[in-house]
């Protein structure tokens, strides 16, 4: 027989036995109850074969196979045991069936207990994490808003300052314009806009005529009059 690859786990050994003895072992569906003393039959049948399997590996694989839920489900009243070739080797007795039923119930109870323990642990961890959830909502949004408000408050004085700086400039320009007197008739021409000073106030006027005695102007209100150059401004 050809050399078999080395089998490292009990599951691999079971897969090998199912391939070597398909009428006795299986990897899917309900397993058939095994003949009492099947271990000795395996050792005798496989003696001399270069399969690399030890007695310890065979015993561990059989223990795993016969304790699986799939195998225990197959141990029931009326079922027959089989040998390596699938031949019937006697009907299961009630004592063996009851023992298998108890093993199956205990196995299911252990699995359920493990599931319940995981659920409790997950629930406890969830409760411990719950107080931390509100923290993201309390991160620094308020601080950022305060910062924005603070920046706005800083900008307002700047705008006021800029406005206050611009106003004196406008006044100075106006003052300069009002304080420019007409010193010579040569500075004037017909239709030119000038200002006529009357006390502390000045009124806009348009030049109508220029004579040696004075300048005839028309005020914005329609009144025409003759004024001297010292009463005119640009």
Swiss-Prot record:
Annotated stretches, region: Disordered: 104-186
Q: Where in the cell is it found?
A: Cytoplasm
Give me the Gene Ontology terms describing cellular component: cytosol
Q: List the disulfide bonds.
A: none
Q: Mind listing the UniProt keywords for this protein, alphabetically?
A: Chaperone, Cytoplasm, RNA-binding
Q: Main localization of the protein?
A: cytoplasm
Ranges of Basic and acidic residues compositional bias? 104-130, 143-156, 163-176
User: Which residue stretches, if any, does this entry annotate as coiled coil?
Assistant: none
Query: GO molecular function terms here?
Result: RNA strand annealing activity; RNA strand-exchange activity
Which terms under GO biological process does the entry name?
post-transcriptional regulation of gene expression
Feature: compositional bias, Polar residues: 177-186
Q: Where is the composition biased (Basic residues)?
A: 131-142
Q: What does this protein do?
A: RNA chaperone with significant RNA binding, RNA strand exchange and RNA duplexing activities. May regulate ProP activity through an RNA-based, post-transcriptional mechanism.
- Record-stated family: Belongs to the ProQ family.
Read off the NCBIfam families from this record. PRK04950.1
Q: Which PANTHER family match?
A: RNA CHAPERONE PROQ
From the Swiss-Prot or TrEMBL record, give the protein name: RNA chaperone ProQ
The protein's organism comes out as Edwardsiella ictaluri (strain 93-146)
Its taxonomic path starts at: Bacteria, Pseudomonadati, Pseudomonadota, Gammaproteobacteria, Enterobacterales
């Amino acid at each position: 027989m050809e050399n078999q690859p080395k089998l490292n786990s009990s599951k691999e050994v079971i897969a090998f036995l199912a391939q070597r003895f398909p009428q006795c072992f299986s990897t899917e569906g309900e397993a058939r109850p095994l003949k009492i003393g099947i271990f000795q039959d395996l050792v005798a049948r496989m003696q001399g074969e270069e399969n690399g399997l030890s007695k310890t590996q065979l015993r561990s694989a059989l223990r795993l196979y016969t304790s699986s839920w799939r195998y225990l489900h197959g141990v029931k009243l009326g079922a027959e045991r089989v040998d390596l070739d699938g031949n019937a080797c006697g009907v299961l007795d009630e004592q063996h069936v009851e023992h298998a039923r108890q093993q199956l119930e205990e196995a299911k109870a252990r699995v359920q207990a493990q599931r319940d323990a995981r659920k409790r642990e997950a629930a406890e961890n969830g409760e411990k994490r719950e107080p931390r959830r509100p923290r993201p909502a309390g991160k620094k949004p308020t601080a950022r808003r305060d910062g924005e408000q603070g920046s706005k408050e800083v900008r307002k004085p700047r705008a006021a300052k800029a406005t206050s700086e611009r106003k004196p400039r406008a006044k100075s320009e106006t003052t300069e314009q009002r304080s420019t007197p007409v010193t010579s008739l040569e500075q004037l021409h017909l239709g030119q806009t000038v200002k006529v000073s009357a006390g502390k106030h000045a009124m806009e006027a348009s030049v109508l005529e220029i004579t040696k005695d004075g300048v005839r102007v028309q005020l914005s209100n329609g009144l025409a009059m003759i004024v001297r150059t010292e009463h005119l401004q640009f």
